[in-house]
């Protein structure tokens, strides 16, 4: 028998990188979430990370730092997809970012300055918006006038024979947070009949 020597050359083949496991996470409404990404490449290639979100937010990647910014006032789940690439092949993964709700302050509607005659009352309809759809309660304060708030209806009755100007402060609250506005009430003088 005879022997022969054969040279066998094993050509390198690029192996796809792997992305380290991504755990679900949570963040408060109107806050950003940051995560350091990591992966491995058996060939020792440098990795580039890419990411995308399904909706209700934006995403950016700076090196291996992933930052997700939910849309303003959004709460709920965001699906985040991540890719680790060596320029030829890639590995991917995803996780769910849960955005937990945070109470937002109501916003009261502006009120125009008002004028009434002496010895009369003023009635004004109040309005406000609350993105959280909470129940809203109104209140008002000023000088010596009598103030009654019934639902969204404000009634102001100045003292008898009073004339002049006063600032009225109106506040709306959702039970936790509040917003206020002011307007000026001018009470015009009215001639009173003399008494004998």
Pin down the residues of each PLM region:
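PAS/LOV and related PAS-like sensory modules
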Residues: 18-22, 108-110, 196
């Amino acid at each position: 028998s005879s022997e022969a020597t054969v040279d066998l050359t094993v050509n390198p083949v690029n192996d796809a990188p792997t992305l380290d496991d991504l755990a679900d996470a949570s963040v408060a409404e109107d806050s950003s979430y940051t995560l350091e990404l990591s992966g491995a490449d058996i060939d020792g290639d440098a990795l580039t990370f890419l990411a995308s979100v399904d909706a209700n937010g934006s995403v950016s990647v700076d090196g291996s730092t992933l930052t997700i910014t939910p849309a303003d006032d959004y709460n709920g789940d965001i699906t985040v997809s991540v890719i680790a690439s060596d320029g030829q092949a890639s590995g991917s993964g995803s996780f769910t970012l849960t955005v937990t709700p945070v109470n937002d302050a109501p916003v009261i509607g502006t009120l125009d300055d008002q004028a009434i005659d002496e010895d009369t009352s003023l009635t004004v309809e109040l309005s406000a918006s609350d993105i959280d759809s909470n129940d809203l309660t109104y209140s008002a304060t000023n000088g010596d006038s009598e103030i009654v708030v019934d639902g969204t209806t404000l009634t102001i009755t100045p003292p008898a024979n009073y004339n002049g100007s006063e600032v009225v402060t109106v506040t709306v609250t959702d039970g936790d947070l509040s917003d206020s506005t002011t307007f000026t009430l001018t009470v015009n003088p009215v001639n009173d009949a003399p008494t004998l």
